[in-house]
Swiss-Prot record:
Any one Gene Ontology BP term: rRNA base methylation
Gene that this sequence comes from: rlmC
Native organism taxonomy: Bacteria, Pseudomonadati, Pseudomonadota, Gammaproteobacteria, Pasteurellales
Name of the featured protein: 23S rRNA (uracil(747)-C(5))-methyltransferase RlmC
Active site (catalytic residues): C348 (nucleophile)
Native organism: Haemophilus influenzae (strain PittGG)
InterPro entries: 23SrRNA_MeTrfase_RlmC, MeTrfase_TrmA_AS, MeTrfase_TrmA_CS, SAM-dependent_MTases_sf, U5_MeTrfase_fam
Binding-site residues for [4Fe-4S] cluster, renumbered to this chain: C4, C12, C15, C93
Binding site for S-adenosyl-L-methionine: Q218, F247, E275, N321
Physiological role: Catalyzes the formation of 5-methyl-uridine at position 747 (m5U747) in 23S rRNA.
Any one GO MF annotation of this record: 4 iron, 4 sulfur cluster binding
Residue ranges the record marks as coiled coil: none
The entry's keywords: 4Fe-4S, Iron, Iron-sulfur, Metal-binding, Methyltransferase, rRNA processing, S-adenosyl-L-methionine, Transferase
Keyword match Transcription regulation: no
Length: 392
């Protein structure tokens, strides 16, 4: 069991499974996964051993509520948003790398120097709501975001920024996010960059990726790298030359698979990536350019739009990495119709994935693996490779 004083003192119970031995956590998650697939014929599927995480220090991102006073800011959580007296400082949370604690100490000093009054939800007063810190494992560079109510403190922040950069030279991206609403909403739409660099470079398995301020990126780099590595190893076994990556984000799955396929089969690979976020598409396209992948087309569209496009060349492989709601019946039925040889399904919600697999009646699972992206909790991710059933 992790030695966590916050848990022991009942100050933070985010890690609901902290008292369960790690091996038992994996056993229970694997059992839960199999229960979600109980109605799917997995007799021919290869069940790989769960991909394990480090038990602590595995997170590359900290999301800290700011409370307290400008002289003595508290970075952590509010057990009761309407009562700032219940604030818990989580700067020593064992889920973060140990060096994050020293960074938080420097940021507390910066808050005072810049006069960033912590926002008080009950009184609806103050400026600084959250501090969001992300680290690149590949470069050890940092992205720092201040979530503020208004732009009022921007001149003071700019004035104090050189001193902050002296103390934290690894800061690559610094931005202000404006969230003016009096509500427990993490971030607003407007991002003001204080650095020339707007993306944080990361690298998994030799694939350059770029973390953007308002975008999704996995918070457990070791397990994320393992997830992408498994994906590329699984698909590289087959002669696949045309693939779609739906819900592609910054391109992690598609780029890993396209690079591996091109190296294995020695032919150009056509990759089409679909993602609703335009900034994610910019990041994915930049990665493809660095890799020298020429036949790549990342488009800022809703993944459901592929259903309407009847003229696209039919893919050999479709990768889906949907949000928790899954891909749904309509997209599942569309995949049954166009019948790619393979579907690679990555899910953060095995329950909705199980329902989707029931709709994918033309497919059978070949490989299944659990990835423990969120140790100390009941959550996990799963990767399934599906093959089109042969017609007798």
């Amino acid at each position: 069991m992790i030695d966590c004083r916050y848990y022991q003192q009942n100050e933070c119970r985010s890690c609901q499974w902290l008292e369960i031995p790690y091996s038992q956590q994996l056993t229970e998650k694997q059992y839960h996964l199999k229960q979600q697939l109980i109605s799917i014929n997995c007799d021919e599927a290869q069940w790989l051993a769960p991909f394990q995480s480090n038990e602590q220090g595995f997170r590359n991102k900290a999301k800290m509520v700011v409370s307290g006073s400008v002289e003595r800011p508290i970075l952590g959580i509010l057990k009761n948003p309407n009562d700032p007296q219940n604030a818990i400082d989580l700067c020593d949370c064992p889920l973060y790398p140990t060096h994050f604690s020293a960074i938080f100490s420097i940021l507390k000093d910066f808050i005072g120097r810049a006069g960033l009054v912590p926002y008080n939800i009950a009184k609806q007063k103050g400026e600084l709501k959250y501090i969001l810190l992300t680290e690149s494992i590949a470069t050890e560079k940092l992205m720092l975001r201040f979530v503020l109510r208004t732009e009022n403190k921007l001149p003071l922040i700019r004035r104090e920024l050189p001193k902050l950069l002296e103390k934290l030279p690894h800061l690559e991206v610094i931005s202000i996010n404006l969230q003016p609403q009096h509500a427990a909403i993490l971030e607003g739409e407007q991002e003001i960059f204080l650095t020339e660099q707007q993306f944080l470079p990361e690298n998994f398995n030799g694939i350059p990726l770029f973390i953007r301020p308002q975008g999704f990126f996995q918070t457990n780099p070791k397990v994320a790298a393992g997830l992408y590595a498994s994906a590329q190893q699984w698909v590289a076994e087959f002669p696949i030359y045309n693939l779609w990556d739906l819900f592609c984000g910054v391109g992690g799955f598609g780029l890993h698979c396209a690079k591996a396929l091109q190296e294995k089969w020695g032919k150009p690979i056509k990759l089409t990536g679909i993602e609703i976020s335009s900034s994610a598409i910019l990041a994915a396209s930049h990665s493809a350019k660095i890799l020298g992948l020429e036949h790549v087309n990342f488009q800022s569209l809703d993944a459901a739009s592929v259903i309407e496009n009847k003229n696209e060349n039919k893919p050999d492989l479709v990768i889906v990495n949907p949000p928790r709601r899954g891909i749904g019946k309509e997209l599942s039925e569309f995949l049954n119709q166009i019948q790619p040889h393979f579907i690679l399904y990555s899910s953060c919600n095995a329950m909705t994935m199980g329902k989707d697999l029931q709709h994918l009646t033309c497919y059978k699972p070949l490989k299944i693996q659990l990835f423990d992206m969120f140790p100390q909790t009941s959550h996990y991710e799963v990767l399934v490779l599906l093959e089109r059933k042969k017609i007798n």
